[in-house]
A protein has these predicted regions:
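Individual transmembrane alpha-helix segments
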Residues: 80-111, 189-198
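Alpha-helical transmembrane segments of multi-pass membrane proteins
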Residues: 38-54
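Membrane-interface segments at or immediately adjacent to transmembrane helices
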Residues: 294-383
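Interfacial segments of alpha-helical transmembrane regions
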Residues: 126-151
Length: 451
């Protein structure tokens, strides 16, 4: 018997049919450690159990991760200060690789290791944990399924990596961080993103259907392995979670390892080997029905969240009334024409309108300056204000002699100014015109990059 093998047999309904058999001593120790560590991780890592709130997630406060970690955070801070000599805090940045999470994992490892030693000393006569392992595997399978559905719907409804913003099109490639490259590469092809998400959603659904759980584990393992590699190579701050999701897949595969080996080597695979917590035909059916309802509950929540995100900042979001990239052709300040000198810190090169109530000024040195924007289409008035400013940067009237021309006239930074801008034809950008499927291509299309 393999060290990690849980020797069991089940009938076609998933019920145990063989009497309990002794486990390998090393296997018992590894189970105790895995039970403690992965059980604690699923409970204390703030993202694992929140999925089960389903549609109620929309009602949770924005600082729910801090509230979730309120129990473990004092311990984590103490360990960080005492053991690692650093003061850690939970930042609401969306990063899953903050120091506070790494120290949390360290604490869980220490607790699991100490608990394993104590458990082994107090439970030396126990020869197997078949019943307990059945409930443990069910618990982590549900947790894994929730994560697969959550991340899957975020891509299937393409909002996790939205289409590159207009300012992204103006940013030099060398200024991109690796994560920006990955996000833009996926976001430029919503179909590709949706297919990635569909695979993850399918993995989550298969995990929750009793007869397809093994297929769900295998599909989830492939998906999470790819995600983890991308996170590691593009420095995406979800390395810790994606690695643990991949480990959960491997833990779920442990009981099925002999069957998979037999199948891959052309031998009879036999019945499912994963122990089941339900013993009667009736409870098995009730459990299967409950898992189907869980699919509906979780999916409803994530479809709702995805639809809201799609309308808020995805492809279905509202655009600015003056949407587009506007290039300055004439710039007059205090009645004097201002030449387009790269050293001029006050002259504009471009003005970008993308999201409502936002504008971005591109200076002559190509620096991008985000601003708040109030556009009154009735009065043809544009007010711009910096993020930290207490007074308006610009109060300008505007007119459009033609759809592709914009004339601003008013006060800019306390000076009278008149600015004439022409709208950039986004169709001229290879990233926009080169999209789509081309079955016939005489040459590779690298846009303007290769010259």
């Amino acid at each position: 018997m393999s060290v990690l093998t849980i020797d069991t047999a089940t009938d076609r309904e998933g019920r145990d049919t063989d009497p309990a058999r002794s486990w390998n001593p090393i296997g018992r120790i590894l189970f105790r450690f895995g039970f403690l560590y992965f059980g604690l991780f699923c409970v204390f890592y703030p993202q694992m159990l929140i999925d089960f709130a389903g549609p109620l997630q929309r009602r949770l406060p924005d600082d729910w991760p801090r509230l979730w970690m309120s129990v473990s955070l004092p311990m984590v801070k103490w360990v960080g200060h005492t053991v690692f000599g650093t003061d850690v805090a939970l930042h609401e940045t969306g990063s899953g690789d903050q120091a506070v999470f790494w120290i949390l994992v360290f604490c869980l490892l220490v607790i699991a290791a100490a608990g394993t030693v104590l458990w082994t000393m107090l439970d030396r006569t126990r020869t197997e944990y078949r019943r307990l392992s059945a409930w443990f595997l069910l618990f982590i399978r549900l947790c894994l399924a929730g994560q697969m559905l959550g991340y899957g719907f975020a891509k299937a409804i393409p909002t996790q990596m939205p289409e590159p913003a207009l300012t992204t099109l103006l940013t030099p490639y060398g200024d991109f961080a690796p994560m920006s490259v990955l996000w833009s590469q996926v976001g430029v092809s919503p179909v590709y993103e949706s297919l990635l998400g569909t695979a993850e959603v399918l993995g989550g659904v298969l995990l929750l259907l009793p007869r397809t759980r093994l297929a769900g584990v295998l599909l989830s393992l492939v998906s999470m392995a790819q995600v983890w590699v991308l996170n590691m190579t593009f420095d995406v701050p979800v390395k810790l979670l994606s690695f643990h999701l991949m480990l959960l897949c491997l833990v779920l595969l442990v009981p099925e390892a002999p069957r998979l080996t037999a199948f891959l080597t052309g031998r009879a695979a036999g019945p499912p080997a994963t122990p089941q917590p339900f013993r009667t035909r009736r409870t098995v059916r009730w459990a299967a029905a409950a898992q189907v309802l869980l699919i509906v509950w979780l999916s409803a929540g994530y479809v709702w969240i995805g639809a809201d995100n799609w309308r808020e900042y995805g492809g279905g979001s509202a655009k600015s009334e003056l949407y587009g990239i506007w290039t300055v052709t004439d710039f007059t300040r205090d009645g004097q024409p201002v030449p387009p000198l790269l050293t001029d810190e006050s002259r504009w090169r471009r003005l970008v309108f993308d999201q409502p109530k936002m504008a971005v000024v591109q200076r002559m040195d190509d620096e991008l300056m985000p601003l708040g924007a109030q556009i009154d289409t009735g009065a043809h008035r544009l007010v711009l204000r910096g993020a930290q400013a207490t007074t308006d940067l610009a109060d300008l009237g505007y007119e459009q002699p033609t759809p592709n021309r914009l004339v601003l006239n008013g006060r800019l930074d306390g000076h009278p100014a008149t600015i004439t801008l022409d709208q950039l034809d986004l169709g001229q950008l290879p990233l926009r015109t080169g999209r789509g499927l081309h079955l016939i291509q005489e040459d590779a299309n690298f846009g303007k990059v290769m010259g």
